[in-house]
Amino acid sequence: MTKRKFVRFGLTIAALALLVTASGHAWGYTHENRLTFSRPVALPGVVLPAGSYSFDVASPTALDVVVVRNARSGKVLYMGFTNTVTRPRAMSPNTPIAFGEATANEARPIAAWYEIGATLGHQFLYR
């Protein structure tokens, strides 16, 4: 009888652990930031017109891959690898974008995206 109780107890603990893990993923942390630009901006290989966009990581296991979607339609407009970079000390934790330089007639390139409040960001790779 004690062996049966021990096995039953072990199975109950295992089921509880699976339940806690599954609910943790359902209520997990999201990396998404919705950003609005009043002028066109550029990412490697694409120019985004003025508008609202969702910046996110591809998955919790691929933090170096960033996906940018149209905020309304959800259509993927950009997906690419990034380098992890530290937020500059002088940059506010509420500033999500660092821009690169462009001429007057070009869209400003987004150099890096920093999740709001995060100390690390995603540097876009231009070639």
Residue ranges and their predicted role:
Residues 62-66:
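Short aromatic-glycine-enriched beta-strand elements
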Residues 68-115:
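Mid-chain, structured segments of secreted extracytoplasmic proteins
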Residues 117-126:
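Short, low-complexity, Pro/Ser/Thr/Gly-rich segments in the mature regions of secreted, periplasmic
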Residues 22-42:
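Short acidic, Pro/Gly- and aromatic-enriched capping/linker segments at domain boundaries
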Residues 1-6:
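N-terminal secretory signal peptides that target proteins for export/translocation
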Residues 10-21:
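Bacterial N-terminal signal peptides
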